[in-house]
């Protein structure tokens, strides 16, 4: 896998879709907490705007999009033949259990399901997310999804490194092994951005595992903040997304970072991000209340 830096404009063919601002969790580090207010979902306009957009990789986000499972199904069905890839990011709300047949129909049409978790223990995961409708989304629902061979291949589980939760080698090791045990085949490990007080360094807590696997991590800013790593202790695909000084004021820039930053002053990077809001409006980036 190529090492990626999203700030370098490499995701030029992606359309972020905020399907809804509604969510049944209240994560303290939610990246959408300062986003603009709910605009009211209009599926027909969303489908029309998506088809008109030149972007061909669609990432459906929230809030929690699968709270509106029927509308997600309608939207995905409406755009499927017009785009290349469709991905959904979710924390697996309980209403999936209540209409699992519709969820399976959505899974059959999409290319990837990005599942956001905060812990390997269901109760702790619910607590960290401040879930308003807690349920066994890992040991029961996620396991059920992964029992289907075709669906399991589409699942990627994302875990944030957060102080007080997954913040040391033992807890991260237990998380990865728990995912392996229920049939997950791909895990993405994220360092927090713009949350200095809660930040945990992957390189620091997993230094023994990295050494054992002969992996030396270089500056995420200069050499790619997202990359795949192959750790000897695990039989699964692992993607690592690290933070740099641009998104964490407590991190220092290396000499190579300063050189790259200097060069970027003379290289114009065209803005490539596009965001579709739930009312069908397209924007050149994520809008905030500020």
Task: Put a short name on every predicted segment.
Residues 50-52, 103-109, 143-151, 179-181:
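Acidic (Asp/Glu)-rich catalytic clusters
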Residues 1-9, 260-290:
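Radical SAM enzyme core and accessory elements
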Residues 73-81, 142-153:
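Surface-exposed amphipathic alpha-helices with a cationic face
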Residues 70-76, 96-106, 166-176:
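Distinct, well-ordered alpha-helical segments
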Residues 1-45, 53:
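Canonical Radical SAM [4Fe-4S] cluster-binding loop centered on the CxxxCxxC motif
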Residues 14, 31-41, 55-68, 82-98, ...:
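Core AdoMet radical
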Residues 39-41, 123-128, 132-139, 154-265, ...:
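Radical SAM enzyme [4Fe-4S]-AdoMet core and its adjacent flexible, acidic
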């Amino acid at each position: 896998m190529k090492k990626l830096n999203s700030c370098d404009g490499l995701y030029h063919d992606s359309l972020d879709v905020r399907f809804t601002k509604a969510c049944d969790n209240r994560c303290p580090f939610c990246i959408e907490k300062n986003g603009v207010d709910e605009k009211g979902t209009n599926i027909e306009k969303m489908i029309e705007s998506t088809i008109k957009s030149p972007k061909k990789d669609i990432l459906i986000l929230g809030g929690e999009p699968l709270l509106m499972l029927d509308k997600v199904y309608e939207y995905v069905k409406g755009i499927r033949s017009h785009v290349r890839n469709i991905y959904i990011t979710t924390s697996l709300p309980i209403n999936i259990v209540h209409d699992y047949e519709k969820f399976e129909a959505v899974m059959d049409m999409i290319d990837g399901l990005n599942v956001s978790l905060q812990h390997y223990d269901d109760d702790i995961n619910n607590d960290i997310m401040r879930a308003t409708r807690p349920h066994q989304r890992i040991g029961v629902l996620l396991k059920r999804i992964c029992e289907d061979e075709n669906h399991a291949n589409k699942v990627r589980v994302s875990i944030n490194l957060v102080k007080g939760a997954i913040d040391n080698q033992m807890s991260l090791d237990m998380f990865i092994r728990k995912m392996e045990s229920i049939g997950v085949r791909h895990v993405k490990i994220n360092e927090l951005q713009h949350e200095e007080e809660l930040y945990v360094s992957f390189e620091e807590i997993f230094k023994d595992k990295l050494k054992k696997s002969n992996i030396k991590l270089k500056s995420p800013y200069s050499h790619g903040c997202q990359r795949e790593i192959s750790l000897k202790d695990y039989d699964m695909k692992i993607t690592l997304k690290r933070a740099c000084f641009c998104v964490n004021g407590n991190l220092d820039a290396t000499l190579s970072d300063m050189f790259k930053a200097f060069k970027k002053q003379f290289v114009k990077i065209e803005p490539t991000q596009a965001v579709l809001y739930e009312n069908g409006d397209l924007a050149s980036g994520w809008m905030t209340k500020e």
